[in-house]
From Swiss-Prot:
It is found in: Cytoplasm; Nucleus. Its EC number is 3.-.-.-. It comes from Debaryomyces hansenii (strain ATCC 36239 / CBS 767 / BCRC 21394 / JCM 1990 / NBRC 0083 / IGC 2968) (Yeast). This is Probable metalloprotease ARX1. Probable metalloprotease involved in proper assembly of pre-ribosomal particles during the biogenesis of the 60S ribosomal subunit. Accompanies the pre-60S particles to the cytoplasm. Belongs to the peptidase M24 family. The lineage of its organism: Eukaryota, Fungi, Dikarya, Ascomycota, Saccharomycotina.
Length: 564
């Protein structure tokens, strides 16, 4: 179903309301400050609980999520109380452990106690919007074993090693490099010749893809499908990808087909028999109105980008294989492996293209609150409760009781498709030998309608003729693989000739954990990366980068919010 929007209204929403001015920049900055503060707060809770031993029992994922969301909500209550109509959470706090990719934010009433162990890598993801202008962030931290005291300070006994360390290094370096490359759009004359051999003086999607792929290859990593570097706009921060086709989509998106193409290109170089590859790129640079992602676009000044890079190392596997995503729900694993991870989706998003006359009073009340408070951004059922945001353990106990009453209304909304659950995904590794030996009589035309996909990316392996349904069936032969994720939001600001990169999230406030990788950048890639990163440090002749700093946290008592 397509929503009817007049062209004049579309121009206002997509163009006029996204032209940077001082008011819009301030809204972005405040959203970035709150997001940075929320991230710092959740990291401090993890450190206090798992590294410093300040709590009697470790915090669970449920407690970390509700405490993080509560902190962000309290900070939002202090800003823009009379000037705007909408503000809130653009991405609920989610805690992704090891192989989990995103949207894992269990409710406080979940019976399972999700905790961490030494050696785990944990990704914290959250987002904030002010009047629809969003700032999202993701950062991966390491859970260390019991530390040692050095100079009266407790420190980790040593760095994290192995494949997890490789993925953290690759994700961090790729994110920092892409931020610097995006900043070159403000001063394209400084673009390194290694990245622009034709001297076009343009920053393109192809350059972004090539540099990220080179960094991943250097660390023996694979870019996880779903990673993207995309432009975001007011109310369009990628929160409804796969549900709503976004007009004028502009960004680089990684999928399984990119791994397939890289493998086939490598095969063509080493063999006289050439395979015919489909060229998905356009013939010239364009900023057309297509909703289908393409690398053939030019990064321009006064645009806002979200850099979301996920890496996983394949060092633990001897054979070549495909990294893909598996969707997890409460039924996963019930008919095969008893110990397999399973959980319910808890993050939802409203679909305004669907209307239905609800029967239950509870459902109508819940829908009204969703439309009023959350609009097009994701939410959790706990966010609709009167006891949210929670400030103490008594609020958490009340919140658990209120969730029971709201679940009946939520079920009708989900059954009538008025809201869609955002799937919890995990990274999986499938050997290519398994893929090549499988029979596929139906060809590549079997599309999994339940799996959200961007337009043009419904078929994961087009050259091998493997459909999404067939790939889903092959997941029973897959192995879980840990991933690291780094996400940051940046503004390429030229308003009033500022020519500066405003980094809303990430940066020095998201310093990588102590890890050590046996890999390093290959010489050609290292030259380009070093050049770009050096420009970000040269304030006079390089790229001017300003980072949003977190707010000062007042004295809270997070221990009082811990459940028994």
């Amino acid at each position: 179903m397509q929503l009817a929007v007049h062209q004049d209204d579309a121009d206002i929403l997509l163009k006029e309301r996204n032209q940077l001015n001082e008011s819009i920049l301030d809204k972005y900055r405040v959203a970035g400050q709150i997001a940075q503060t929320g991230l710092k707060y959740v990291i401090s809770l993890i450190n206090d609980s798992y590294h410093l031993g300040k709590t009697e029992t470790p915090y669970t994922c449920q407690e970390l999520c509700v405490m993080g969301d509560s902190m962000v909500t309290r900070l939002l209550a202090k800003v823009y109380n009379n000037d705007i109509r909408e503000k809130g959470i653009s991405n609920p706090v989610s805690i992704e452990l090891n192989e989990i990719v995103g949207n894992f934010a269990p409710e406080i009433d979940d019976a399972s106690k999700f905790t961490f162990n030494a050696g785990d890598i944990v990704t914290i993801t959250l987002g904030v919007h002010i009047d629809g202008y969003a700032a999202n962030v993701s950062h991966t931290v390491v859970i260390y074993p019991t530390g040692v005291t050095i100079d009266n300070e407790l420190k980790p006994p040593g760095p994290l090693l192995g494949s997890k360390a490789d993925s953290i290094c690759a994700a961090h370096i790729a994110t920092e490099t892409v931020v610097a490359l995006l900043g070159m759009a403000l001063t394209p004359e400084k673009l390194p010749t290694q990245l622009d051999p034709n001297n076009t003086k343009l920053v393109t999607g192809k350059q972004i893809r090539n540099i990220v792929n080179s960094i991943a290859e250097s660390f023996n990593c694979t870019v996880v499908p779903g990673s993207k570097v995309r432009r975001i706009r007011r109310f369009l921060a990628g929160q409804a990808e796969g549900v709503v086709a976004e007009k004028d989509f502009k960004g680089v998106v990684w999928s399984e087909s990119d791994q397939e193409e890289l493998l086939l290109n490598k095969y063509n170089k080493n063999d006289d028999q050439q395979l015919v590859l489909h060229n998905k790129q356009g013939s010239e640079f364009t900023n057309n109105s297509s909703a289908i992602p393409t690398d053939e676009f030019v990064v321009a000044a006064d645009e806002v980008y979200n850099v979301d890079i996920k890496m996983c190392s394949t060092s633990d596997f001897k054979e070549l294989g495909l990294v893909t995503l598996e969707e997890i729900d409460e039924f996963t694993g019930l008919n095969n492996k008893t110990n397999e991870f399973k959980t319910k989706s808890t993050i939802y998003i409203r679909d305004y293209a669907v209307n239905y006359q609800l029967r239950l009073k509870n459902s109508r009340s819940l829908l009204g609150k969703i439309d009023k408070e959350f609009t097009v951004f994701p939410f959790k059922l706990s966010h609709t409760s009167p006891s949210f945001p929670a400030t103490n353990s008594q609020d958490l106990a009340t919140l658990k009781k209120e969730l029971i009453a709201n679940k009946l209304g939520l079920s009708e909304l989900a059954n009538r498709h008025l809201i869609n659950a955002k799937p919890i995904q995990v990274t999986k590794f499938i050997p290519f030998e398994t893929i090549l030996k499988t029979s596929n009589p139906t060809g590549k035309h079997g599309i999994d309608s339940n799996k959200p996909a961007l337009p043009g990316m419904e078929i994961p392996l087009p050259h091998l003729g493997i459909s999404s349904l067939k790939l889903k069936a092959l997941l029973k032969n897959s192995s879980s693989i840990a991933n690291a994720r780094e996400s940051t939001t940046v503004i390429l600001n030229s308003f009033n000739n500022a020519n500066e990169v405003i980094r809303l999230t990430g940066g020095n406030n998201s310093a990588p954990s102590w890890v050590h990788s046996d890999y390093s950048l290959n010489p050609q890639c290292k030259e380009s990366v070093d050049h770009l990163l050096q420009l970000t440090k040269d304030k006079r002749f390089g790229i001017k980068v300003k980072e949003c700093q977190p707010m000062k946290l007042t004295a809270d008592a997070p221990e009082s919010m811990q459940m028994d």
